[in-house]
């Protein structure tokens, strides 16, 4: 079990690192280049591949890469392929500047996001195969620990390095690190022996309609109405965080925090808080069921958003920033752990990759599509109303969660 958890931690690190490349780190790069808030919000669409990766998951479940599969095995061969693609395109991005050619910059970033989301899908499926259902809560905490650590390297580390290096140089370093992670993963998976659930479907009928196929693989989970309810919850629950994440860098720069303060408090302390929150959330879920944990964590996290309003009123204040980021990150780590544990608990039987990707894609929709209006909200209504909005929109998700809980208890 301990070996499996080590591999899961590495899975999390790689996923967290990759998503920052086209996520918050890219967002900070755009903000530093004085790209308009409306444009920054619109470019959250770069992470759209995370919303539709479930469409490609059947390929990862069923299709073997002829030569790599013999050497590395089914999942690891796909990981190798996507990692090499990421190294290549991240290196290309390191020669571009968003201010000079925003369209080309965004296009390459979108390609990186596509391969990153593919790899995230494969790693997530791999994770559901090597952990038994009873350990999902704790394993999710370990995964989030690694995920946040990867985010720390690619986000806080990059912003701190931007004091001394250009972002073009930093993204060249990213390309090298992705290759190193691949080597570590190959060694870890090949030489750490663990029990793996091997009931993964290897063939599928390519003539089947994709929607009929998805309907069939989701059938063991529940009725169509119940699944729709779950999808609505998955979209709404992460919506407040995703709005904030798109605008947090412009907000901190607006308050005149410098790169060192943003890297150390806004990012490093934020990730540390999220790691603590993830582990704390995993520990609590060992004693409390997943749905009750999601409800409790969601309420606490919503209250933490109010601190951003207080920070805006007081202006630049290092102590208040420390408290705000700490409260936001710890409670956010708890909600994320419960969220992932909930998704993982839904996956069962064959085609786990497709099931997990389909549900986690709702998180992608929440992260990529709805936040495109975040910049417009800030420009037209101000920062205080923006953060008030992110607090209020937590309520619908919790009401849907109660509906799900009632259906499960019937």
From Swiss-Prot:
Matching NCBIfam families: 2A0125 (TIGR00901)
TM stretches of this protein: 5-25, 40-60, 76-96, 98-118, 141-161, 169-189, 217-237, 265-285, 290-310, 320-340, 356-378, 383-402
Bilayer topology term: Multi-pass membrane protein
An example Gene Ontology CC term for this record: plasma membrane
Family in the record: Belongs to the major facilitator superfamily.
Name of protein: Putative transporter AmpG 1
GO molecular function: transmembrane transporter activity
InterPro entries found in the cross-reference section: AmpG_permease/AT-1, MFS, MFS_dom, MFS_trans_sf
Chief location category: membrane
Protein location: Cell inner membrane
Top-level taxon of origin: Bacteria
Pfam families: MFS_1
Record lineage: Bacteria, Pseudomonadati, Pseudomonadota, Alphaproteobacteria, Rickettsiales
The organism of origin for this protein: Rickettsia bellii (strain RML369-C)
PROSITE patterns the UniProt entry points to: MFS
Keywords (A to Z) from UniProt: Cell inner membrane, Cell membrane, Membrane, Transmembrane, Transmembrane helix, Transport
């Amino acid at each position: 079990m301990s070996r499996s958890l080590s591999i899961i931690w590495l899975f999390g690190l790689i996923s967290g690192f990759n998503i920052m490349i086209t996520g918050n780190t890219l967002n900070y790069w755009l903000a530093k280049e004085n790209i308009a808030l409306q444009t920054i919000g619109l470019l959250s669409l770069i992470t759209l591949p995370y919303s539709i990766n479930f469409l490609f998951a059947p390929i990862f479940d069923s299709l073997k890469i002829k030569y790599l599969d013999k050497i590395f095995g089914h999942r690891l061969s796909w990981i190798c392929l996507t990692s090499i693609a990421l190294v290549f395109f991240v290196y290309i991005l390191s020669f571009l500047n968003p201010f000079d050619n925003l369209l080309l910059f965004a296009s390459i970033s979108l390609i990186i996001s596509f391969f990153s989301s593919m790899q995230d899908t494969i790693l997530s499926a791999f994770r559901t195969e090597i952990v038994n259902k009873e350990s999902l809560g704790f394993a999710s905490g370990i995964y989030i620990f690694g995920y946040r650590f990867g985010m720390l390297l690619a986000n806080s580390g990059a912003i701190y390095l931007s004091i001394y290096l250009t972002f073009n140089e930093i993204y060249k370093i990213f390309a090298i690190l992705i290759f190193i992670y691949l080597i570590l993963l190959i060694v870890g998976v090949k030489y750490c022996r663990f029990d793996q659930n091997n009931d993964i479907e290897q063939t599928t009928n390519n003539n089947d309609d994709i929607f009929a196929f998805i309907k069939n693989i989701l059938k063991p989970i529940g009725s169509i109405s119940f699944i729709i309810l779950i999808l609505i919850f998955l979209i709404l629950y992460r919506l407040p965080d995703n709005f904030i994440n798109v605008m947090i860098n412009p907000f901190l720069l607006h308050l005149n925090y410098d790169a060192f303060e943003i890297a150390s408090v806004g990012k490093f302390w934020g990730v540390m808080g999220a790691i603590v929150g993830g582990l704390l959330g995993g520990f609590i879920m060992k004693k409390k069921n997943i749905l009750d944990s999601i409800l409790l964590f969601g309420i606490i996290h919503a209250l933490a958003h109010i601190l951003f309003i207080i920070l805006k009123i007081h202006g630049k204040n290092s102590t208040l920033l420390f408290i705000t980021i700490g409260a936001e990150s710890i409670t956010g780590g708890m909600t994320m752990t419960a969220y992932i544990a909930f998704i993982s608990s839904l996956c069962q039987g064959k085609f786990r990759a497709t099931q997990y990707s389909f549900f986690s894609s709702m998180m992608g929709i929440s992260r990529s599509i709805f936040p495109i209006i975040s910049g417009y909200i800030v420009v037209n209504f101000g920062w205080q109303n923006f953060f008030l909005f992110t607090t209020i929109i937590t309520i619908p998700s919790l009401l849907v969660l109660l509906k799900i809980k009632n259906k499960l208890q019937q």
